[in-house]
Amino acid sequence: YLLERLSIVEGALGRITERAPARLVEQRDRLRASVQELAAGVAVDDQRLAQEIAILADRLDVHEELSRFASHNVAFRQTLARRDGEPVGKRLGFLLQEMLREANTTGSKSNDAVMLADVVTIKEELERIREQVENLE
């Protein structure tokens, strides 16, 4: 059950990873168009504008969050596969907290309906996993 749920999370994460670069370009282009519209007839330093757009694009980039999320998924699978008799429930709970944190940050940075739908799916599945993990030792 846990691995099935984790596979659903990974599928949604994969879709977000595929969508993220295009969404970043769309956001950058939309921002550039908005600034040009606002600055019509006003002298604007193109270099400064490019710098500001780059800073905003960096704030919208979810690559780091997705990378950390993927590493938490690997750690979760490895922990589930442990056969040394050590309790795994707490560790899995901590990993789920980190996954949820990355999902929340990704959602807040996304500003994209398609990506947000996948973030909601991830959060739903993480909650289902958490309910089951609470019963593990």
PLM-predicted stretches and their roles:
Residues Y1-E137:
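N-terminal intrinsically disordered, cationic/polar leader segments
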